[in-house]
Amino acid sequence: MTRLDFRNLLHEIWLKSDTDFSGVGIIVCDTPICLPIMNLRGDSPAISGTTAEVLSHLSRTESKYHDGFHIINQMGLITHIAQYFSPPIVLNVNIDRSRPIGGRFTAAIFGSAIPGVLMTGIVSEGHGLSIFENGHETLFETLK
């Protein structure tokens, strides 16, 4: 998955979202066993539809799976849903604090520095769309 492919996926999730969109955090990784994650729900929903359709639906506030990060592999297939993601703090990360940031943003930027993580990305109404690679924000878009 290229950065452009990932950007397009994140944008499509946002476009397909409804008024109760809670935002989304996604980790692109083929080796999730190495990630500091924990399943927040203990179960997983039935997955039917494209990755963008499924993640857009799960990112509604009415979905019990809207919290945490979802994991996809480099082929864009969902491997894990609603994972608590607790990456270690990366001290030398440059964070643009002129925009509103929160826990999802910091987990995504720190988590992108974990070996085996190709990229992380977030989308939210208040923040926009961001992609992170190797502890750096490599793409930011305001959504309208």
Positions of predicted regions on the chain:
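Divalent-cation
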Residues: 1-144
